[in-house]
C-alpha cells in the first residue's frame, strides 16, 4: 500500500470526518447536533467554507488543522507538508490554508506555530509568483511570528523571509507589510484584535497565558523593528503612540504584576524622538522610574529605570515637575546607602547619573557638599549582609573605585574631597578583607596602587593612608588579610609599598610564604629598599617550615640576602630539609662559606640518601660533585643504579687519564645495567650518553642471561621492550664499533649450544613422538638425567626468554637491497637456530607434562619466537654439522644428502648400506610403501644388533609408519605384513627369550633403570605400546572381519595386557613422565579388568603391608596392591594416575577378598544367625591411603572414585539392596572427608573456594567463547559430567572432578544432600548454584530415562513428564488404579522428591506406610528413583497377594532389605524378617531386646 493510500485510509477512519460524510450524504445541516459531535469542528466549517477545488484527502487534512487536540493539528500540518511535496497542483490548497494562517501562527502549541512557518515556506518556494495573492494574509503573520517568544518559531519565521523571497526584495517585503504588522500588534496589546481572544478549538493554553504571550510578542514587534532599522524610521511611531494615548492600557500595565510588560513599554517609550515628552505625559512612568532605581529583582526593571533617569535628568521639563534637590538627590542617597542586588546595575549608571545631577544642580560649593555626602553614603549600612550576592558586592567596590578615580582626576575637586576620601578608602579596604575573593581584593589594591602612582596626593598623605591600611591588616588577622597582603606586595609594585612589605615580613603573625616569594621575585631597587627595613629575619630562618615547591624561592631569597653586604643579622642553620637540600644543589662559594662549610658530613649523607629514595640521580651527582670539589667525599653506593646519577657523573668526568679508565668502565657498566633493568624506558639523552662511552671491547658480562634467569613469571612485553632498547642503543653506536658491541651483548653460537645441552632428556620426546626421520647421536646411548617438572619448566622458560630477546633484536640482521633478500651473520644464524630449537623444546616440554598447561609466558614466548623465525639456507647449513641437535633436525626437513651423511657419520666404524639409506630417506613414499620396503628388504627387525644406530633407526621408523598406517594394517593386501607388524609388538614386549634378544619387560624386570641408561630402548618400547593402542582402538571402532577381531581379542589382547601389568610393577614412585610412562598410563586406562594370566614370577620383591596380611591375598595380589597405592602418593601426576588405574582394576579383588562372608551368594535367605551379620568394609588400603595433609592434592578425589566403585552395577559388582545399604554405611565417614577434599581442597585457581567454582567457571567460559559455534554450554556439561575422558590433558583433573561429582550425586544422593546441609554457609550457595544449574538437570534426565526404559509388567504403567520432572506410576487392579506421583525438584538431590499417592486400593494406614518407606529409602538410604518405584511395586504386589505382615515391624516388605518375612517359626508357622530378629540396621532387634532366642508369638525356641 502506498503512502497516499494509507493516508486516505486513515482519513476515512477518522471519526469526525466520517460523521461529516454521513451528514453530507443524508442532507443534514449543523442543526440538532448531538453532544458526541465535535462542535468546534462544526463551527470552524463556516470559516473553511466548502473547501471547493481540493480533493478529499486534502480536505480531510485541512479539517485536522481545526481539531481541538493540538497533536491532531500537528499531524495535519505534517501531512499537509507531504501533500505539498508530492502534489503539483496546490493553488487551491494554498488559498484555503491562507485563511487558517492567523489562527495557526498564533496557536497555543509552539510545535503548531513552528510547522505553520515551515508550511508557509514550502508554499512560497513551490508556488513562487503564484503565491502573491495570499501574501497579504500570510506575511504580516510571518513578521509577527519573527518576534515569537519561542526561539524555534522565530527562527522558522525568519527562514520564511530568507527562503521565500529573493535577496533584494526581502527588505522591501518587510517595509511593505510592516504597517499592517504594527497595526495588528497595537490592537493585540490593547485587546482590540480578534487574535487576542483564544480560538474555540485551541485548548493548548488558557486565556491569561495566551494574552501575556501575545502582548509580549506584539511589543517585541516594535522593539525588534527599531533595533533592525534604527530609530530614524518613524513608520512604527503612529501605531505605538496609540498605546501611550490609551490611559486605560497604561493603567493596566503599570498597575499589574507583569514586570516584563512594564519594561517593554518603558523601552518603547524611550525610543520616541520626543521621549521625554512621552514619559512626562504619562505620570505612572515617572513614578515607576523613581520607585525602581533600587529594584532587587533579577529582571531588567532596575536598569530600565536608570536608563529612564539618565534620559530625564538633563531635561528642563523634568526639573519643573520633579525637584532635583528635594526629590532626586535624596532618592540617590537612599539608593547608595542601600546594600543589595541593585548594585549590579548601579555600577554602570550611578556615576553618569551623579555627574548629570551635579551639572544640573549648579554651584561648585553646593556640588562639593553633595558629592561628599554621596561618597559618605557608600560606607553607610556596612557591613554587607551575609546573604548578599558576591557580584553585587564586587559591583559596589568597582563603583566606589570609579568614583574615587573620577574625583582624583578632577583638578577642581580632588584636593577638597581628599579629606573625606581618606577614611572612606581605609574603610572600604577594611571591608574588602571580609570577602575572600581575589576580584574584590584586586579592585582595592589596584585603586591604592593607582593613587600612589598618580602623585596627585602628597607623600605624607599617602604614607598616612598606608599606615592606616597596615593597622587594618593587623586587626583583620592573618587569614582575612591574606589576599590584600599578597596583592599589595606583588612584584612590580611601587617602591612606596616597601615599608609595608618590610613591616609584614618582620611580623611573624602576619608573614606567609607568598609575601616572602614576592620579595624574592622583586626588582633590585624594591628588594634593597625592603630588605634594609626588615627588623626580624625569623620568617626565613626556620627552613623546616617550607615544602619542596617553596624551597626554590626561599633559597633564591637567602642567596640574595647573603649577597647583600648590609645585612648582618641572618642566622640560618642548614638541615636535611627541602631548603637545605636546595642550598646544597645551588652551591657557590658564598653559600658554602657562609652556610654549608660547617655542616656535618652526616647531614650531607642524609640528603643523598633522601634523593636515592626519590630516585633523583641528577641531584645526587650534582651534590656529590660539588662536595668533592669542596673536599668532602660521600658514599654513593645506594645510587649506583640511578641512571641520572651515573650519566651526570660521566659527564662531570673531565679527566681522561689512565687512572680514571677503570672507574669510567665501572660507571659505563653500571649505566648499562641501570638502563636495561629499569621498569621505565630511558630517555633519548640517556641512550646517547651510553653510546658515546661504549667501545668495541665493552663486555656486558652475560648481563641479559642473568637478567632473564628469574623463576618468577616474566612479562613478554618487557623482553620485547628490552630488545627494542638494545636496538636503540646499537643504532646510536659508531659504525666501526657497532658489530663488536652486538657480539658482546647478544648470545654467541657457542653459548646457545651450551644452553641446549641442558635439554638432552627432552630429546626422548622427539624420538618417541616426531613423525619425521629421527637422528640418533651417540649421546642417546648414555644415561639421561631427567629433571623434575619445576626445574625443567624453569630452565626452559629462561631459555625461551633469551631466545626471544636475541631473535627480536633488529640489529641481528641486515639487508642487501640490491638482491632484496635477508642475509644473516654468524650470530644471526646462530640465533635463528637457537630459536628453532627452543620452540621444539617447548613443544617437547608440553608433551612431557601434558597434565599441566604451559604457563602463559611459555605459550606467548613460543608464539612470539615462531613469528620471528625464518627458514633460510644459513639455518639449513647447520644441519651439515657432524652433531646436529635432534630438536633442529625435527624442526627442519633434511635433504637426502644431509640425512645420508649424518647416518653414515653416526654408524662408525661400519658404514650404513646404501639400500638402508634408500629405505629410510626415500622421498615421497607413503607409510605403506615404507612398511613394504622394510618387510621385503630382510632387515634386522625387532631382534637386531643394538650397537648399530641405523638398526635402531629402521626399527623406530618402522613402528612410526605402522602407527601412521593405523588400522589399515588389518586389511593390508599383503597378509604377511599384517602378521609381521602384529607379531613385532609381542616380540618387542614379550617376556620370552629369543636367541640373544632380551625384551623390554625382561630388561625392566632385571634393571628398572634400563630406559634411563639407553633412551633408544624406551623410545622403541613406547612406540610399540602406542601402536598396540592404535590398533586396539581400530578394532573397537572400525569394521573389521570377525575372524580378525576374535584373533585380536583371544591372542594379542590378553598377552599384551599382562605385559602392561608387569610393566606397571616396575614403575618407580619418583619416575618422571617420560614417553614410556605416559603411554603406559594410556594403556592402563584401556584395561577393564585385572588380567588373570599374570605369572607369579612377576613378583620380584614383596613389600610387607600389615593391613593386607590379615586377608587371604595371594602374594601376587598383595604385591600389586601395595605397588598401586604406593604410586598414588607420588609427586608425579602421571605416576599417580598409573597407580589409580591399577588400583581401579584391583578394587573388585580387594572388595571380595575383604568381605567374603557378606558377599556369599550361597547364603540361605531364610537362615537366621544368632550373632550379628558382618558389616561390609571399605577396602583397607583405600582408607589407609587417605592423605593427612594437602601435599598430594589429587589423592583424595582419586580414592573417592575407587571407594564408590562397588556401588556401580558392573560385571564385577552386583550388590543387592541390603548390601548397598551396608556399604553406604561403611563408607559414610570416608565419603564425607573425600567429598570435602573434592569440593574444598582442590587448589585449581581458587584458594579456600570449592572446586565447583572452577567447574562453573569452565562452563561459563565455554558458553561465552563458543556461543556462536557448535560448542554449546549444554554439550560442555555433558562432556564434563557424563563422559569419562581419560585423555592426559590440562583439563584431565577438572573433568575428572566434574565426573566424580556427578557419580557421587548419582550413587549417593542422600550422602551428598547431608554434605550440602553441613558445609559452611559461605560455600553453600555456590555449591547449590552449580549443582542446580549443571548437574541436577542431567541427573534428573538420567533418572527419568532409566524409569522410562524400565519394564514393570502389566499391572504397573509408568510415564514421565520431563518438563516438570514428574514420574507418574499407576498400579491397576481390575478397574481400580492407584497412582503414585514423584516430582523431582530442580536441585535434586539437594532437595528430596515430593511424593503423592492417590486412590489407595488398600487400607489408608498401609498405603501410608508404603509411602513413608519409599520416602525413607530415597531420603536416607541413597536410593535411586527406579529402585524406589520397584520397591513400592513389590509392597503393593505382596499386599494384594495377601502376604502376611511380619508381626515385629508390622510390614510385609522390610524397610531396609526390601525382603518379605522368610524366617519361619517351626512351632506356630509364622514368618518374620530375619533383620527384625537379629540386625544392627533396624530399631527392632527382638533377640537383643528380649535377651533370648524365642519366637515373639509362641515363645518356642528358634534354635
Curated annotation (Swiss-Prot):
Substrates-to-products reaction catalysed: S-ubiquitinyl-[E2 ubiquitin-conjugating enzyme]-L-cysteine + [acceptor protein]-L-lysine = [E2 ubiquitin-conjugating enzyme]-L-cysteine + N(6)-ubiquitinyl-[acceptor protein]-L-lysine
Residue ranges covered by zinc fingers (RING-type): 1446-1499
Top-level taxon of the source organism: Eukaryota
GO cellular component, one term: cytosol
Example of a GO biological process term: rescue of stalled ribosome
HEAT repeat placement: 52-89, 93-129, 133-170, 280-318, 323-345, 346-384, 552-589, 640-663, 664-700, 845-882, 1022-1065, 1078-1117, 1141-1183, 1302-1340
Pfam families (UniProt xref): LTN1_E3_ligase_5th, UBC_like
Pathway: Protein modification; protein ubiquitination
GO molecular function list: ribosomal large subunit binding; ubiquitin protein ligase activity; zinc ion binding
Keywords linked to the UniProt accession: Cytoplasm, Metal-binding, Repeat, Transferase, Ubl conjugation pathway, Zinc, Zinc-finger
Localization, UniProt: Cytoplasm, Cytosol
InterPro entries per UniProt: ARM-like (IPR011989), LTN1/Rkr1 (IPR039795), LTN1_HEAT_5th (IPR056241), LTN1_UBC (IPR054478), RING-CH-C4HC3_LTN1 (IPR039804), Znf_RING (IPR001841), Znf_RING/FYVE/PHD (IPR013083)
EC number: 2.3.2.27
Family of this protein: Belongs to the LTN1 family.
Subunit structure and binding partners: Component of the ribosome quality control complex (RQC), composed of at least the E3 ubiquitin ligase ltn1 and nemf. The complex probably also contains tcf25 as well as vcp/p97 and its ubiquitin-binding cofactors. RQC forms a stable complex with 60S ribosomal subunits.
Role according to the record: E3 ubiquitin-protein ligase. Component of the ribosome quality control complex (RQC), a ribosome-associated complex that mediates ubiquitination and extraction of incompletely synthesized nascent chains for proteasomal degradation. Ubiquitination leads to vcp/p97 recruitment for extraction and degradation of the incomplete translation product.
Name of the protein described by the UniProt record: E3 ubiquitin-protein ligase listerin
UniProt organism field: Caenorhabditis briggsae
Amino acid at each position: 500500500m502506498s503512502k497516499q493510500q494509507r493516508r486516505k485510509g486513515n482519513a476515512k477512519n477518522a471519526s469526525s470526518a466520517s460523521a461529516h460524510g454521513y451528514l453530507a450524504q443524508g442532507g443534514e445541516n449543523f442543526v440538532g447536533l448531538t453532544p458526541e459531535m465535535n462542535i468546534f469542528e462544526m463551527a470552524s466549517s463556516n470559516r473553511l467554507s466548502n473547501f471547493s477545488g481540493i480533493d478529499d484527502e486534502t480536505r480531510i487534512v485541512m479539517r485536522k488543522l481545526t481539531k481541538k487536540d493540538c497533536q491532531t493539528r500537528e499531524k495535519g500540518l505534517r501531512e499537509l507538508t507531504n501533500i505539498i511535496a508530492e502534489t503539483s497542483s496546490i493553488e487551491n490548497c494554498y488559498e484555503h490554508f491562507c485563511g487558517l494562517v492567523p489562527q495557526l501562527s498564533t496557536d497555543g502549541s509552539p510545535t503548531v506555530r513552528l510547522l505553520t512557518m515551515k508550511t508557509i515556506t514550502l508554499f512560497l518556494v513551490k508556488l513562487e509568483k503564484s503565491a502573491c495573492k495570499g501574501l497579504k494574509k500570510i506575511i504580516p503573520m510571518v513578521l509577527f511570528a519573527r518576534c515569537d517568544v519561542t526561539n524555534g518559531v522565530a527562527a522558522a519565521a525568519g527562514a520564511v523571509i530568507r527562503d521565500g523571497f529573493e535577496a533584494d526584495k526581502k527588505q522591501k517585503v518587510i517595509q511593505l507589510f510592516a504597517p499592517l504588522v504594527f497595526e495588528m500588534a497595537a490592537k493585540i496589546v490593547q485587546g482590540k484584535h480578534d487574535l487576542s481572544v483564544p480560538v474555540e478549538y485551541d485548548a493548548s493554553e488558557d486565556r491569561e497565558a495566551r494574552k501575556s504571550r501575545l502582548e509580549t510578542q506584539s511589543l517585541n514587534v516594535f522593539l525588534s523593528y527599531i533595533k533592525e532599522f534604527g530609530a530614524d524610521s518613524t513608520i512604527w511611531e503612529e501605531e505605538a503612540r496609540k498605546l501611550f494615548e490609551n490611559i486605560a492600557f497604561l493603567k493596566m500595565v503599570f498597575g499589574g504584576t507583569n514586570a516584563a510588560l512594564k519594561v517593554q513599554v518603558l523601552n518603547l517609550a524611550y525610543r520616541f524622538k520626543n521621549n521625554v515628552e512621552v514619559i512626562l505625559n504619562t505620570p505612572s512612568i515617572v513614578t515607576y522610574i523613581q520607585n525602581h532605581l533600587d529594584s532587587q529583582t533579577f529582571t531588567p526593571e532596575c536598569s530600565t529605570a536608570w536608563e529612564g533617569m539618565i534620559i530625564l535628568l538633563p531635561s528642563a521639563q523634568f526639573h519643573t515637575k520633579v525637584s532635583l534637590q528635594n526629590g532626586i538627590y535624596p532618592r540617590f542617597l537612599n539608593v547608595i546607602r542601600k546594600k543589595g542586588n541593585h548594585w549590579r546595575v548601579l555600577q554602570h549608571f550611578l556615576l553618569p547619573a551623579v555627574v548629570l545631577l551635579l551639572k544640573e544642580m549648579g554651584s561648585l560649593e553646593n556640588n562639593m557638599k553633595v558629592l561628599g555626602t554621596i561618597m559618605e553614603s557608600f560606607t553607610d549600612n556596612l557591613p554587607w549582609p551575609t546573604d548578599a550576592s558576591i557580584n553585587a558586592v564586587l559591583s559596589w567596590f568597582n563603583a566606589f573605585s570609579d568614583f574615587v578615580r573620577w574625583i582624583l582626576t578632577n583638578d577642581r575637586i580632588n584636593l577638597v574631597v581628599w579629606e573625606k576620601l581618606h577614611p572612606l578608602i581605609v574603610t572600604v579596604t577594611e571591608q574588602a578583607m571580609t570577602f575572600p575573593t581575589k576580584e574584590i581584593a584586586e579592585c582595592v589594591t589596584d585603586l591604592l596602587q593607582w593613587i600612589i602612582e598618580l602623585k596627585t596626593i602628597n607623600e605624607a598623605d599617602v604614607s598616612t593612608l598606608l599606615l592606616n591600611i597596615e593597622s587594618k591588616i593587623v586587626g583583620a588577622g592573618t587569614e582575612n588579610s591574606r589576599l590584600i597582603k599578597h596583592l599589595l606586595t606583588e612584584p612590580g609594585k611601587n617602591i612606596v609599598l616597601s615599608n609595608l612589605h618590610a613591616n609584614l615580613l618582620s611580623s611573624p603573625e602576619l608573614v606567609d610564604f607568598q609575601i616572602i616569594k614576592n620579595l624574592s621575585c622583586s626588582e633590585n631597587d624594591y628588594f634593597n629598599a625592603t630588605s634594609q627595613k626588615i627588623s626580624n629575619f625569623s620568617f626565613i630562618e626556620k627552613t623546616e617550615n617550607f615544602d619542596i615547591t617553596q624551597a626554590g624561592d626561599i633559597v633564591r631569597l637567602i642567596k640574595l640576602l647573603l649577597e647583600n653586604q648590609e645585612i648582618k643579622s641572618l642566622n640560618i642553620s642548614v638541615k636535611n630539609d627541602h631548603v637545605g637540600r636546595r642550598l646544597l644543589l645551588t652551591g657557590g662559594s658564598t653559600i658554602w662559606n657562609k652556610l654549608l662549610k660547617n655542616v656535618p658530613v652526616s647531614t650531607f649523607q642524609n640528603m643523598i640518601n633522601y634523593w636515592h629514595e626519590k630516585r633523583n640521580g641528577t641531584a645526587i651527582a650534582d651534590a656529590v660533585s660539588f662536595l668533592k670539589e669542596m673536599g668532602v667525599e660521600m658514599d654513593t653506593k645506594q645510587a649506583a643504579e640511578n641512571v641520572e646519577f651515573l650519566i651526570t657523573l660521566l659527564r662531570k668526568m673531565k679527566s681522561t687519564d689512565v687512572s680514571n679508565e677503570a672507574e669510567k668502565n665501572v660507571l659505563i657498566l653500571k649505566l648499562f645495567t641501570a638502563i636495561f633493568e629499569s621498569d621505565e624506558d630511558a630517555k633519548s639523552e640517556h641512550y646517547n650518553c651510553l653510546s658515546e662511552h661504549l667501545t668495541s671491547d665493552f663486555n656486558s658480562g652475560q648481563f641479559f642471561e642473568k637478567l632473564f634467569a628469574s623463576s618468577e613469571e616474566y612479562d613478554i612485553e618487557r623482553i620485547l621492550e628490552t630488545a627494542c632498547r638494545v636496538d636503540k642503543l646499537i643504532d646510536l653506536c659508531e659504525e666501526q664499533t657497532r658489530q663488536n658491541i652486538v657480539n658482546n651483548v647478544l648470545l654467541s653460537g657457542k653459548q646457545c649450544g651450551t644452553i641446549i645441552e641442558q635439554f638432552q632428556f627432552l630429546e626422548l620426546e622427539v624420538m618417541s613422538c616426531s613423525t619425521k626421520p629421527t637422528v640418533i647421536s651417540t649421546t642417546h646411548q648414555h644415561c639421561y638425567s631427567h629433571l623434575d617438572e619445576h626445574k625443567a619448566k624453569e630452565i626452559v622458560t629462561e631459555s625461551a626468554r633469551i631466545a626471544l630477546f636475541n631473535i627480536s633484536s633488529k640489529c641481528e640482521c641486515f639487508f642487501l637491497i640490491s638482491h632484496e633478500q635477508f642475509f644473516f651473520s654468524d650470530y644471526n644464524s646462530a640465533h635463528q637456530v637457537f630459536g628453532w630449537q627452543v620452540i621444539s623444546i617447548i613443544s617437547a616440554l608440553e608433551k612431557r607434562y601434558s597434565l599441566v598447561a604451559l604457563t602463559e609466558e611459555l605459550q606467548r614466548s613460543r608464539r612470539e619466537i615462531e613469528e620471528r623465525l625464518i627458514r633460510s639456507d644459513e639455518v639449513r647449513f647447520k644441519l651439515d654439522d657432524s652433531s646436529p641437535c635432534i630438536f633442529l633436525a625435527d624442526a627442519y626437513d633434511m635433504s637426502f644428502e644431509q640425512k645420508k651423511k649424518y647416518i653414515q657419520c653416526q654408524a662408525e666404524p661400519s658404514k650404513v648400506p646404501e639400500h638402508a639409506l634408500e629405505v629410510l630417506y626415500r622421498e615421497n613414499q607413503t607409510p605403506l610403501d615404507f612398511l613394504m620396503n622394510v618387510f621385503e628388504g630382510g632387515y634386522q627387525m625387532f631382534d637386531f644388533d643394538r650397537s648399530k644406530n641405523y638398526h635402531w633407526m629402521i626399527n623406530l621408523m618402522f613402528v612410526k609408519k605402522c602407527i601412521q598406517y593405523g588400522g589399515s594394517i588389518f586389511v593390508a593386501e599383503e597378509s604377511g605384513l599384517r602378521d609381521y607388524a602384529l607379531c613385532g609388538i609381542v616380540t618387542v614386549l614379550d617376556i620370552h627369550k629369543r636367541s640373544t634378544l632380551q625384551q623390554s619387560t625382561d630388561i625392566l624386570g632385571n634393571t628398572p633403570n634400563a630406559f634411563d641408561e639407553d633412551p633408544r630402548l624406551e623410545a622403541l618400547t613406547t612406540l610399540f605400546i602406542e601402536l598396540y593402542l592404535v590398533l586396539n582402538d581400530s578394532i573397537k571402532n572400525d569394521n573389521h572381519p570377525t575372524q580378525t577381531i576374535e584373533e585380536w581379542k583371544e591372542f594379542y589382547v590378553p598377552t599384551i595386557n599382562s605385559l602392561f601389568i608387569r610393566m606397571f610393577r616396575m614403575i618407580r614412585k619418583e619416575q618422571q613422565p617420560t614417553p614410556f610412562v605416559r603411554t603406559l598410563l594410556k594403556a592402563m586406562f584401556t584395561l577393564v579388568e585385572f588380567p588373570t594370566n599374570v605369572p607369579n614370577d612377576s613378583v620380584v620383591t614383596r613389600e610387607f603391608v600389615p593391613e593386607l596380611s590379615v586377608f587371604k591375598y595371594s602374594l601376587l595380589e598383595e604385591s600389586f596392591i601395595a605397588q598401586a597405592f604406593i604410586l598414588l602418593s607420588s609427586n608425579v601426576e602421571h605416576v599417580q594416575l598409573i597407580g589409580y588405574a591399577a588400583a581401579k582394576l584391583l578394587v573388585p579383588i580387594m572388595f571380595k577378598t575383604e568381605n567374603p562372608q557378606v558377599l556369599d551368594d550361597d547364603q540361605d535367605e531364610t537362615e537366621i544367625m544368632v550373632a550379628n551379620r558382618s558389616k561390609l568394609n571399605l577396602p583397607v588400603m583405600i582408607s589407609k591411603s587417605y592423605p593427612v595433609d594437602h601435599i598430594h592434592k589429587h589423592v583424595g578425589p582419586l580414592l573417592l572414585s575407587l571407594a564408590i566403585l562397588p556401588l556401580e552395577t558392573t560385571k564385577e559388582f552386583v550388590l543387592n539392596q541390603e548390601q548397598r545399604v551396608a556399604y553406604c554405611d561403611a563408607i559414610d565417614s570416608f565419603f564425607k572427608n573425600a567429598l570435602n577434599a573434592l569440593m574444598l581442597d582442590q587448589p585449581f585457581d581458587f584458594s579456600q573456594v570449592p572446586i565447583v567454582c572452577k567447574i562453573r567457571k569452565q562452563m561459563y567460559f565455554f558458553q561465552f567463547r563458543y556461543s556462536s559455534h557448535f560448542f554449546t554450554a549444554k554439550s560442555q556439561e555433558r562432556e564434563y559430567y557424563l563422559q569419562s575422558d581419560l585423555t592426559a590433558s590440562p583439563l584431565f583433573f577438572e573433568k575428572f572432578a566434574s565426573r566424580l561429582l556427578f557419580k557421587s550425586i548419582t550413587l549417593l544422593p542422600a550422602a551428598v544432600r547431608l554434605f550440602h546441609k553441613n558445609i559452611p554457609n559461605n560455600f553453600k550457595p555456590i555449591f547449590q548454584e552449580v549443582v542446580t544449574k549443571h548437574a541436577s538437570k542431567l541427573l534428573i534426565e538420567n533418572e527419568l530415562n532409566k524409569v522410562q526404559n524400565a519394564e514393570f509388567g502389566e499391572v504397573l504403567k509408568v510415564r514421565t513428564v520431563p518438563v516438570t520432572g514428574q514420574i507418574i506410576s499407576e498400579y491397576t487392579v481390575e478397574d481400580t488404579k492407584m497412582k503414585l506421583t514423584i516430582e523431582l525438584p530442580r536441585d535434586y538431590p539437594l532437595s528430596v522428591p515430593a511424593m503423592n499417592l492417590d486412590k489407595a486400593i488398600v487400607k489408608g494406614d498401609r498405603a501410608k506406610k508404603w509411602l513413608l518407606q519409599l520416602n525413607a529409602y530415597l531420603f536416607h538410604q541413597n536410593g535411586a528413583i527406579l529402585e524406589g518405584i520397584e520397591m513400592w511395586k513389590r509392597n503393593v504386589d505382596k499386599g494384594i497377594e495377601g502376604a502376611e505382615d511380619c508381626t515385629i515391624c508390622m510390614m510385609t516388605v522390610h524397610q531396609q532389605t526390601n525382603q518379605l518375612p522368610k524366617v519361619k517359626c517351626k512351632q506356630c508357622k509364622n514368618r518374620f524378617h530375619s533383620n527384625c530378629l537379629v540386625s544392627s540396621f533396624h530399631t527392632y532387634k527382638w533377640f537383643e531386646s528380649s535377651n533370648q532366642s524365642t519366637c515373639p508369638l509362641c515363645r518356642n525356641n528358634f534354635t
